[in-house]
Amino acid sequence: MLKSILCTFVPLSTANFKPIYCDLFEANYVINYLAMRGPKLQTFVIKSLIQLVCRITKFGWFDDDKFRDIVKEAADFLSLASQDHYFIGLKILYHLVGEMNQANAMPLTLHRKIACSFKDQFLLQIFQISLTSLHQLKSEVPDDFRRDPLSLALRCLSFDFVGCPVDESSEEFGTVQLPASWRPLLQDPSTVQIFFDYYKVNDTCVSKEALECLVRLASVRRSIFVEDPSRTQFLSHLMSGTKEILQTGQGLADHGNYHEFCRLLGRFKVNFQLSELLSIEFYGEWIGLVAEFTTKSLLSWQWASNSVYYLLSLWSRLVTSVPYLKSDTPSMLDETVPKITEGFITSRINSVQASFANDSSDDTLDNVDVLQEQLESLPYLCRFQYQNSSIYIINIMEPLLQAYTERSRLPAPGDANELSVIEGQLTWLVHIIAAILKIRQTIGCSQESQELIDAELAARVLQLINVTDTGVHAQRYRVLSKQRLGRAILIFVQNFRRSYVGDQAMHSSKQLYARLSELLGLNDHLVLLNAIVGKIATNLKCYAECEDVIDHTLSLFLELASGYMTGKLLLKLESTKFIIANHSVAVNLEATADAAFWTDVVKYAFIGLMRDLRGIAMATNSRRTYGLLFDWLYPSRMPLLLKAISLCADEPEVTTPLLKFMCEFVLNKAQRLTFDSSSPNGILLFREVSKLIVAYGSRILLLPNGTDIYGSKYKGIWISLAVLSRALCGNYVNFGVFELYGDRALADALDISLKMSLSVPLSDILAFKKLSKAFYGYIEVLFSSHITFVLNLDTNTFVHIVSTLESGLKGLDTGISTQCASAIDSLAAFYFNNITAADGPPSPAALNLARHIGEFPTLFPQILKTLFEIIIFEDAGNQWSLSRPILSLIMISEQVLVFLKLLNHVP
């Protein structure tokens, strides 16, 4: 019996509902079984049985009120004499709360209705049971048993009260929205105190959960306390408990406890105002202990690196509240915050030497997310007493900058390890200054004085920029510490530009530029921007092997070019003119001899050029911008593409970027290829496409099949077909011109593309998704716009192509089957218009089609049969598209048409 009930657990999880009485019987049976045999069962069996009961309860919650008796039945377990039954009851409640809090496989709306009903009726009662159990088990049982009621309390406090589930991958959560009915419990001092008591007297596993409960209690919504005294009393209990932990340090040697305690401290300023903290009698003692704890944490940066964030967040929120403080009570932040700021900066500087000595591969400077997290709160702390903080930073940076400058003048780098340490320390200082300049918030001093201090700090970094690319430092671009420094400088430039570069910033930041003029001769933002662009050019030239620096540099350059004001300013700069004049490698490639084109240097340069051009082509979304690119390429630089594809047709690493660029270049998106009526550019573009396709196809067909046939041949073939398809259906070429003037461009392109497509077996076409999409897209274009070319083929080739269309109809890809249906519709419509219903003499193409069908009379009926089978027996998502060729095929199939007419007249 029990085995059969357990087997229902899987169907239940997939919402396979059974009659209500069956579910009730199973739930009651399991509860009774646990009551009789539970203490003798293995733990995993008890857990599975409880999960089953909770799942049944949730799925039957609104079906019968008897399902809700589970809370009472669990409470009955607590009243039994056996200690084992007591903990089984706690486990039932624990899993019940968890089950009600997760959606499982049921609809989200139904889940929320059940969860809200459970929350309103039973969650408070269960939380009260957990508190009662905590008091009862405080000294009667071992530590392992005390964890059960604590876990139950934590699960109750972690319940999704308002339908906004917390991201389980993140430690951050917002306010805990406890219902108003929970107010008496929170106002009871014993509620908070019991968790502090459990923290003191239990092992680390239990004490960590006690702190987690306190973190959630500290996060309850402010409005749950109707009166200020009750909120103050609640805050006082939290501060008193944390003060005692800070004084004794009990449990903080465990990393889990330490981390949760930092989270608890971080929640104080999230839910409580600074004025409320000041109203607590022992605030001065408490804030002093928190400051001391923070300073020690900063010194133990290796052990507490992930926890310091919450402490710094607390202090940053405290200092940002000072301007709004109306109380005369001293906040003591003037004495504590500078020490914390200096402690953080010192710990970062010292961490470089320690990391280097330990040969640590996990460096914070390489992790952007962790670095951002650590520096997020620092600007507010530094600007609280900006003058003192800036002096402290400058006093640390000046000797390092001087030593780094002296090293640049030496003939050799000297001790490379020592130089790497200096670069690492400078990197941290640059990151710190960049973070400070990112936030322009005045706390305790005027805007003008802050600008002067910003100028002092920025001047040191700008001076460092001038040194990094001189002397022996210009030989160290491959060194990791130098690359980290390069990334830090780019972040500084990005933040500084956003704050102080631009017309509006220029007029509102006169004090800063006046000071920079005195220190470095940078008297306005145009001169400063020129220096920034010069650094960008240097990075692009020297950091070619460091992808991170290049990527960040290009992002900065894009940001400058995309800005309304900075984009205009860039055009005035000498550095920009130099980059524009010297950025292109195409001129050098055009002059390269054929033999030299085989070298790796030339190949890599060409590959990079094609990828860059493809990116540019993707960004040209208007006629004007596309015209600029077209005029730059044609006619002077198109021979380079033809030369490359002719010489390197057997090297897909060269041809693939080239063909992908052309595939993007010929795409008429947003009507960007709409030329003037007197312009031949559309025809000229297609001629260049034809040359490339013919040059590539004539060579690729001669190559033998290798082991990687897709990479060596098929990939280039499908991209070529995509290029030609886009050019044929781009609606910017009048193709009749080619035949009229005897130009073979169209005929040669169609001929070689068909040969390439026929060289691939049908099984391979269907096996490779990208190849099949390109092939059937190409065939659809041929049948819709160039059907005469298809009809002039020999009969076997024609029948093979039509047979591939039938195979495409049977495929699972609706896009491909739609393309096949469209091609068949075009063919059948041509047959009907030019043969079945033709008035005049048939054209040569019509005669060829009639000859093909005469030799294979079952061709059209077989396709019609296939279409009917798909529509009738398969659940196709494109039935409308598949139905279009059916009418055309019926109209050209005389026997079928007569049969349908007779059937229509039968009564």
Describe each model-derived feature in a short phrase.
Residues 1, 13-14, 732, 783, ...:
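Intrinsically disordered terminal tails
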Residues 12-20, 37-47, 57-68, 82-87, ...:
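Alpha-helix boundary/capping segments in eukaryotic regulatory proteins
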Residues 12-20, 143-144, 327, 416-420, ...:
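Short, surface-exposed loop/turn segments at secondary-structure junctions
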Residues 1-6, 26, 42-56, 85-97, ...:
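Extended HEAT/HEAT-like alpha-solenoid repeat tracts in very large eukaryotic scaffold/adaptor proteins
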Residues 17, 30-44, 56, 60, ...:
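Extended ligand-binding groove/face enriched in aromatic
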Residues 6-23, 57-68, 99-108, 115-123, ...:
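Flexible loop/turn segments at the boundaries of HEAT repeats in alpha-solenoid HEAT proteins
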Residues 16-37, 65-86, 111-140, 153, ...:
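Amphipathic alpha-helical segments within extended alpha-helical solenoids and repeat-rich scaffolds
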Residues 253, 264, 273-276, 289, ...:
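Long alpha-helical scaffold regions
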